[in-house]
């Protein structure tokens, strides 16, 4: 489960670079939505992995 947290975090960071950096000017809103979506998924899977570990 921790593996998924890292994957979601990396995807969120890539979406942030494209969305907030202005690289993909036409897809800024989509990149911003993807950033927040994958950031939330990373946090949730990290918390679940901590709960399952105990």
From Swiss-Prot:
Organism superkingdom: Bacteria
GO cellular-component term (any): plasma membrane
Listed InterPro entries: DUF1328
Keyword set, alphabetical order: Cell membrane, Membrane, Transmembrane, Transmembrane helix
Membrane topology label: Multi-pass membrane protein
One Pfam entry name: DUF1328
Transmembrane segments: 6-26, 30-50
Cellular location(s): Cell membrane
Homology family: Belongs to the UPF0391 family.
Descriptive protein name: UPF0391 membrane protein Pnap_0920
Species name: Polaromonas naphthalenivorans (strain CJ2)
Organism classification: Bacteria, Pseudomonadati, Pseudomonadota, Betaproteobacteria, Burkholderiales
């Amino acid at each position: 489960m921790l593996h998924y947290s890292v994957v979601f975090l990396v995807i969120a960071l890539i979406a942030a670079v494209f969305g907030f950096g202005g690289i993909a000017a036409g897809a800024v809103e989509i990149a911003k939505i993807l950033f927040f979506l994958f950031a939330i998924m990373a946090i949730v899977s990290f918390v679940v992995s901590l709960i399952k570990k105990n």
